[in-house]
Amino acid sequence: SFTNNKKGFNADWHYANSNTLLGMLNLYKASNDYTYQAFVDKFNQHVFDHYHFFKEQYCSLRIMRGAYFRLFRATMLDDTGGAALPLAETALNAKPQILHREILDQVLNHILNKQSRLADGTLCRPEPVEQTIWADDMFMSVPFLLNMAQLNKDSKLYDEAAFQVLHINHYLTDPRTNLCRHGWYNQTKELAPVAWSRANGWIVWAMSETLLKLPTNHKKYKKIKDTFT
């Protein structure tokens, strides 16, 4: 389990762990075996119980690669919308926790106000190549935005999620194959040479989440559905 992993990676604030935990939540929904939900709850509680210790390490002691450093580094979507999905997915049914909302609000603020964007508003990467769009960032932003739209009852977050789906897909789609490339470089206006299968999986996942959670009467729903199919 994540509690006895020697390196502690399985307990870390990381998008790979986030995806695994989402899988467990889906297993719980499919099997009604509460063991899966309990594991996710345990992970989330681990974040809350040790949050101030992790924050002290990073913000005061300047331990830049300490436990959960990405939660406080928050320089890209890997650190924010990608890693926070288990908290966002469970927030509607979770017991009220001040830290739960505090972390979600921090992440949402980063996506809306701090994350790098192109001039048209499309989310992009600050590095390793400035203003590069990656397929990763559709799943690291859109599912979180959809959950927060429901939690906050904020239709503008649905609009933002739909905008990112359509714009990221537009930039990354190779018209010759209709596959998404892994990246698009704003500096050269060129697609990356690779249509990475995992990246296409992220796109499919993010778009399917959108079709499941975006209100069907949303003005962009049909366009997203047509793009998906």
Language-model features: where?
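Glycan-recognition and catalytic cores of secretory/periplasmic carbohydrate-active enzymes
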Residues: 1-229
